[in-house]
């Protein structure tokens, strides 16, 4: 490819939300139609309901407690009947307010240009978020951030394993309204949400 033809491609790459060679930051904005289309994605949303279930006390005796539905973390979870969300509306408030939870789901297929790179998914959930990638939410004692919540309106930043052009990942973001103990007067929405492609020695 000649230098002239390379420069001719730059406007097309920009229109798709795909970072051009040497461009900083190298991000694909998942709150734009162009960005989502460039990774063959589609956002879907669903509210979460608390449901009563049988449980156990610490001594093993039975009690009544709560779980939630839908449990939509699996990579192959069928969300085909969920509401399809336009990327530009991810910033809009959703769910019921007060004590509430919800899911945002999409799949992303990595574009050319990720060879030898690291790829991160990052989002900010108003107010707390947990991020499942391909049905997994790894965590450990003392962990702050990554797949689990680390603070109020604080970014979740998760590295996508073994990136390669054409590889698809399932992303499921569990949104939590907060602070829970004050009975929040707001709702749930997504702040800046993107894929970031960085060199191997960057974080």
Give the location of each predicted region.
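Positively charged n-region of N-terminal signal peptides that target proteins for export
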Residues: 1-5
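Bacterial N-terminal signal peptides
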Residues: 8-17
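Boundary at the C-terminal end of the N-terminal hydrophobic targeting segment
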Residues: 19-22
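An acidic-aromatic loop/edge-strand motif
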Residues: 24-68, 82, 155-203
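Aromatic-lined ligand-binding clefts that engage carbohydrates, nucleic acids, or primary amines
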Residues: 82, 108-138, 171-175
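Short beta-strands within extracellular/lumenal beta-sheet-rich domains
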Residues: 98-111, 154-157
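Surface-exposed coil/turn segments at beta-strand junctions on protein surfaces, enriched
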Residues: 99, 114, 151-153, 162-166
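Solvent-exposed beta-strand/loop surfaces of large extracellular or lumenal domains
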Residues: 133-156
């Amino acid at each position: 490819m000649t230098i002239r033809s390379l420069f001719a491609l730059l406007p097309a790459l920009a229109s798709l939300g795909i970072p051009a060679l040497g461009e900083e930051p190298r991000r694909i904005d998942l709150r734009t139609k162009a960005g989502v289309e460039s990774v063959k994605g589609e956002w879907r949303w669903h509210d979460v309901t608390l449901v009563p279930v049988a449980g156990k006390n610490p001594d093993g005796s039975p009690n009544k407690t709560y779980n939630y539905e839908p449990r939509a973390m699996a990579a192959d979870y069928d969300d085909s009947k969920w509401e399809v969300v336009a990327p530009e509306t991810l910033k809009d408030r959703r769910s019921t307010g007060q004590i509430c939870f919800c899911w945002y789901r999409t799949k992303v297929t990595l574009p050319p240009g990720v060879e030898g790179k690291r790829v991160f998914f990052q989002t900010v959930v108003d107010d707390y978020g947990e991020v499942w990638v391909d049905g997994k939410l790894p965590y450990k004692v003392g962990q702050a951030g990554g797949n689990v919540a680390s603070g109020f309106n604080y970014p979740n930043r998760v590295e996508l394993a073994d990136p390669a052009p054409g590889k698809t990942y399932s992303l499921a973001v569990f949104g939590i309204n907060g602070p829970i103990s004050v009975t929040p007067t707001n709702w749930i929405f997504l702040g800046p949400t993107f894929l970031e492609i960085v060199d191997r020695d960057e974080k």
